[in-house]
Amino acid sequence: AILDQSCKGIFDRELFKKLDRVCDDCYNLYRKPYVAIDCRRGCYQNLVFRQCIQDLQLMDDLDEYANAVQV
């Protein structure tokens, strides 16, 4: 996993793993290195992360992920 330096502060490891997993799964879906990097950019607060949520059919969990990246 690539830790984006924009993620600062104290983190819940389980929460971080869950967010990171979205980016890993999205990378596995598309097999493009920039997907994994861009997905994590801005501590997961970006359009690529949101698109990954949609592409992985996780829209039912969108509110949970949105709250997580605002912590």
Curated annotation (Swiss-Prot):
Q: In which tissues is it expressed?
A: Produced by the medulla terminalis X-organ in the eyestalks and transported to the sinus gland where they are stored and released.
What Pfam families does the database record attribute to this sequence? Answer: Crust_neurohorm
Keyword S-adenosyl-L-methionine on entry: no
Q: Which residues are reported to carry the modification Valine amide?
A: 71
Sections of the chain in a coiled coil? none
A GO biological process held by the record = neuropeptide signaling pathway
Compartments annotated for it: namely:
Secreted
Segment forming the signal sequence: none
InterPro entries attached to this UniProt entry = Crust_neurhormone_CS, Crust_neurohorm, Crust_neurohorm_sf, Hyperglycemic, Hyperglycemic1
Superkingdom field:
Eukaryota
Q: Does the keyword GTP-binding apply?
A: no
Q: Which residues cross the membrane?
A: none
- For this UniProt record, give its keywords in alphabetical order, as a comma-separated list: Amidation, Carbohydrate metabolism, Disulfide bond, Glucose metabolism, Hormone, Neuropeptide, Secreted
Q: Name one GO cellular component term.
A: extracellular region
Taken from the UniProt record, the cysteine pairs bridged by disulfide bonds within this chain are: 7-43, 23-39, 26-52
GO terms for MF: neuropeptide hormone activity
Q: Which PANTHER family match?
A: ION TRANSPORT PEPTIDE, ISOFORM C
Family of this protein = Belongs to the arthropod CHH/MIH/GIH/VIH hormone family.
Q: What does this protein do?
A: Hormone found in the sinus gland of isopods and decapods which controls the blood sugar level. Has a secretagogue action over the amylase released from the midgut gland. May act as a stress hormone and may be involved in the control of molting and reproduction.
Please report the name of this protein according to its UniProt entry.
Answer: Crustacean hyperglycemic hormone isoform 1
Question: Source taxonomy lineage?
Answer: Eukaryota, Metazoa, Ecdysozoa, Arthropoda, Crustacea
